[in-house]
């Protein structure tokens, strides 16, 4: 996750063929302590409700520069359908409340994130805003913000995910056009880390017991990968790895539990 967070206009979504998935999400310093304390502060009623389903009001924002980056309604609905399919077994569903389209070359080039979000962000801290941007810098496919305790108005406004436009179902980003980039980024919105270690070690990098230790990100779609022998094969099919879209098909029960905990601790009721 230690990747550049600077966004700049490099090329249109359809003109970049990504060699591998890249995500700019970085957990805040001391985040796991914040997570544990926020969850511990919940009352018995909240912690007993972890098996209840979660429905998230969702706002999709399409940023264009002229015709570059436009996404038709059919593909936006396909993105919501894909996310509902991917998260359904974990008890999470997304309800599309509104889609917006804004023709602004500056925002479509990934510049002025604060200005863009101040103008476009909708809903509350329990709402999901996804900004589809044709030009994310340095080959990034997406970036999203982790949930925080006691969010300020600025934190609420800056919340949400920025996703490359060409990664929606049927999009133009080769190997990453089944809508799973948004699924991956929303995982961070719901408190999930990457399944692999960021420093090449075989530690429990994602704080989830049923994802085996993994010392490196996955590239492509290998038949198998075992970067930490003895702990189980790598989670190459997990949405929180870096595999091709065709390779991704699962969250674990442990990840579903962490999502429920993060939702109750950070977003429910906000």
From Swiss-Prot:
Give the GO biological process terms: proteolysis
Its predominant location is: secreted
> Highest taxon of the source?
Eukaryota
| Sequence segments annotated as region (Disordered) | 208-227
Q: Which residues are glycosylated?
A: 135, 199
InterPro entries reported in the protein's UniProt record:
MetalloPept_cat_dom_sf, Peptidase_M43
The residue range of the signal peptide is 1-19
Query: How would you classify this enzyme at the top EC level?
Result: hydrolase
Q: Does the keyword S-adenosyl-L-methionine apply?
A: no
PROSITE patterns, per this entry? ZINC_PROTEASE
State the EC number(s).
3.4.24.-
Q: Which UniProt keyword terms apply here?
A: Disulfide bond, Glycoprotein, Hydrolase, Metal-binding, Metalloprotease, Protease, Secreted, Signal, Virulence, Zinc
Give the residues annotated as active site.
Answer: 185
Gene Ontology MF terms in the entry: metal ion binding; metallopeptidase activity
What is the disulfide pattern of this chain?
A: 221-247
Relate the protein's function as given in its record: Secreted metalloproteinase that allows assimilation of proteinaceous substrates. Plays a pivotal role as a pathogenicity determinant during infections and contributes to the ability of the pathogen to persist within the mammalian host.
Family (UniProt): Belongs to the peptidase M43B family.
The protein's name is Extracellular metalloprotease MCYG_04966
